[in-house]
């Protein structure tokens, strides 16, 4: 740099740690997207308010701006997948509050221009980015384009910690690092530079790469690496740029556009290095013990999720014993299949039959299952509304209008129910014209005939009539069919399989097979047809409404007996909100109808069943994965950059 910089202020203290994300920068600094080389080429693009990772609102109807912001999000996510921006936001622009007064910002705080006198080094001015570089980046990179070198080209590009004096070029003070354009020197916390690279001027693109794994930094010029400039860098550094003479203008690219330098290739090199280190982790003489432990973890995982045949085969091949009886695994497997198929009523009844005291001891779990059953009724997938979808005119008019009463646990199931016995199979049986009986989807002979008769008339139905059919039910069932062989060979009689640990309901109903055949034949290409509430059946809608009243009564009784439960209250409110929309599937609360929402319910029920066998609620393999994920998060918070290239997902095949 021509001329030595002025001495730093006396008694310069080490910079304080960066402020939390919520206070790191003012809310008035809206970063944006990259701009063109000239003043007229830039397009103002609102981005994130400084200190926040939530996107700022765009002008209504401006699809181009929305698309640019989406592209920025995609690029940053691809470059830095391990970064949680809710916790550690990425730099996206320069901070209008963390700069010297001679610095001017424009074009969404991505363009920097000098507006001072520029007579002496005391007129130098710098600006920091809105946020420090997160360690979870592993490798971080940004570029600066020299729009104009101005009078003398006294420009510095680099890094600095929070609190470093902004009346200086980067690199002149402690915890400050810079590469200067007029002489090509690098400045490492000192006013004396070291020869490093070529000078840079108007039109050049200078990149700065921070390696948070080995704590080094190198620069690039027009896409070519210039080699290591700094080592032993401290954590929590901010991208920084400094100017000193009139006319100097630079533009920043924090990921708004593709970089000139191929930073992704450099990242791939380091990912390979980190993964090789993991693969070479020494086990020593404990390899046999290590393998045995892993085999037990895999076996327990298969048992936990009900992969019965696979668990048996794996146990044989590894000389292990399966901790849970196979009959018990199959029972859990049947229940899981029912839940994942949306047949909640049958799942509840099967659970009551196989594990009589389970839901009685867990009223909140029962309530969760019943709320999910209500959602499946809306969806048209639960058996209690599916069996009403035969479109018999009489059946739509003859459903009893009084809901099943709640009562004490001592009452007979045929006369009432309490929150401890709220299973459809234990309720009073409703009778319909055209159906002999329909309780929890177990349809008698006449009901089955009526149901399947409608299938044979399917080809002659009009579009409005087809709209009343729940065309998505069979597709959802198929989507959640287990890959395990045993899952495919189980047969149902009232939701309970051929074999049972407590010995009842051996053998499957002939009508169940016919029912499944009937369902299969009803799989038609109706993707263009709009779904309707409860499959469009009036009787099913009435049943759903009465069930909702029962659910409300159950909620009130739970509150009286067990106290207030905010989660239960919100769950019920969200479920009832589905009825406020003519098309619940495309409503703001429609995500509840997504089949994937069945999985947490299935997991909770499965864990509760396992606890009755004194088995862990979660498989050890899942706990180990969770612990590894938490460790990676701790590494990121501790500034260990290698966590960026050691994701758990890389080892899940």
Curated annotation (Swiss-Prot):
Residues 1-62, 386-422 are annotated as: Disordered. It is found in: Cytoplasm; Cell membrane; Nucleus. Residues 326-332 are annotated as: Interaction with CALB1. One of its GO terms (cellular component) is cytoplasm. Residues 1-21 have a biased composition (Pro residues). Keywords: Acetylation, Cell membrane, Cytoplasm, Membrane, Nucleus, Phosphoprotein, Ubl conjugation. GO terms for molecular function: small GTPase binding. Ubiquitously expressed, with highest levels in maturating spermatocytes. The SPRY domain mediates the interaction with MET, AR, and CDC2L1. This is Ran-binding protein 9. It comes from Mus musculus (Mouse). The gene is Ranbp9.
């Amino acid at each position: 740099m021509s001329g030595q910089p002025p001495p730093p202020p006396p008694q310069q203290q080490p910079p304080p740690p960066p402020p939390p994300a919520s206070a790191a920068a003012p809310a008035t600094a809206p970063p944006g997207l990259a701009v063109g080389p000239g003043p007229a080429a830039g397009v103002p693009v609102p981005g994130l308010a400084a200190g926040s990772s939530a996107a700022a609102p765009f002008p209504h109807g401006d699809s181009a701006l929305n698309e640019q912001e989406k592209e920025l999000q995609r690029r940053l996510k691809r470059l830095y997948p391990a970064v949680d921006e809710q916790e550690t936001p990425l730099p996206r622009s320069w901070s209008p509050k963390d700069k010297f007064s001679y610095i001017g910002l424009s074009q969404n705080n991505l363009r920097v221009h000098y507006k001072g006198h520029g007579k002496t080094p005391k007129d130098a001015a710098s600006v920091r980015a809105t946020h420090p570089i997160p360690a979870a980046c592993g490798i971080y990179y940004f570029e600066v384009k020299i729009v104009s070198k101005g009078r003398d080209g006294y420009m510095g590009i680099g890094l600095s910690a929070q609190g470093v004096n902004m009346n200086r070029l980067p690199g002149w003070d402690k915890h400050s690092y810079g590469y200067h354009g007029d002489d090509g020197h690098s400045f490492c916390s000192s006013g004396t530079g070291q020869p490093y690279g070529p000078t840079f001027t108007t039109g050049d693109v200078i990149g700065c790469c921070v390696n948070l794994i080995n704590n080094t930094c190198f620069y690039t010029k027009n896409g070519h690496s210039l080699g290591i400039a700094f080592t032993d860098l401290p954590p929590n550094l901010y991208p920084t740029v400094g100017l000193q003479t009139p006319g100097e203008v630079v533009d920043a690219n924090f990921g708004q556009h593709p970089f000139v330098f191929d930073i992704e290739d450099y990242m791939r090199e380091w990912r390979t290095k980190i993964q090789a280190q993991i693969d070479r982790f020494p086990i020593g003489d404990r390899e046999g013990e290590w393998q045995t432990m892993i085999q037990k973890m895999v076996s327990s995982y298969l048992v936990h999720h009900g992969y019965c045949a696979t668990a048996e085969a794996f146990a044989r091949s590894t000389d292990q014993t399966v901790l849970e009886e196979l009959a018990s695994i199959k029972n859990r497997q049947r229940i899981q299949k029912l839940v994942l198929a949306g047949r909640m009523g049958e799942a509840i009844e099967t659970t009551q039959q196989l594990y009589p005291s389970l839901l009685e001891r867990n009223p909140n779990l029962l309530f969760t299952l019943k709320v999910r059953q209500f959602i499946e009724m809306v969806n048209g997938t639960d058996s209690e509304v599916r069996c009403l979808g035969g479109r018999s005119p009489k059946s739509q008019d003859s459903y009893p209008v009084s809901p099943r009463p709640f009562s004490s646990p001592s009452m007979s199931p045929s006369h009432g129910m309490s929150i401890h016995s709220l299973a459809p199979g234990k309720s009073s049986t409703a009778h319909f014209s055209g159906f002999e009986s329909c309780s929890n989807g177990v349809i008698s002979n006449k009901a089955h005939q009526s149901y399947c008769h409608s299938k044979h008339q399917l080809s002659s139905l009009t579009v409005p009539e087809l709209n009343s059919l729940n065309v998505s039910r069979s597709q959802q069932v198929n989507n959640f069919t287990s890959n395990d062989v045993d899952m495919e060979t189980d047969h149902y009689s009232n939701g309970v399989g051929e074999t049972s640990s407590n010995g009842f309901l051996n053998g499957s109903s002939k009508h169940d097979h016919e029912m499944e055949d009937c369902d299969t034949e009803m799989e038609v290409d109706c993707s263009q047809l709009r779904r309707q509430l409860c499959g469009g059946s009036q009787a099913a809608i009435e049943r759903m409404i009465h069930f909702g009243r029962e659910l409300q009564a159950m909620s009130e009784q739970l509150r009286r007996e067990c106290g207030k439960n905010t989660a239960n209250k919100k769950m019920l409110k969200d479920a009832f909100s589905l009825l406020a929309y003519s098309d619940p599937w495309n409503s703001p609360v429609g995500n509840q109808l997504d089949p994937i929402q069945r999985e947490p319910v299935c997991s909770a029920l499965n864990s509760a069943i396992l606890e009755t066998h004194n088995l862990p609620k979660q498989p050890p393999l899942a706990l180990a994965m969770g612990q590894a994920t938490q460790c990676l998060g701790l590494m990121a918070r501790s500034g260990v950059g290698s966590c960026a290239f050691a994701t758990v997902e890389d080892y899940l095949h």
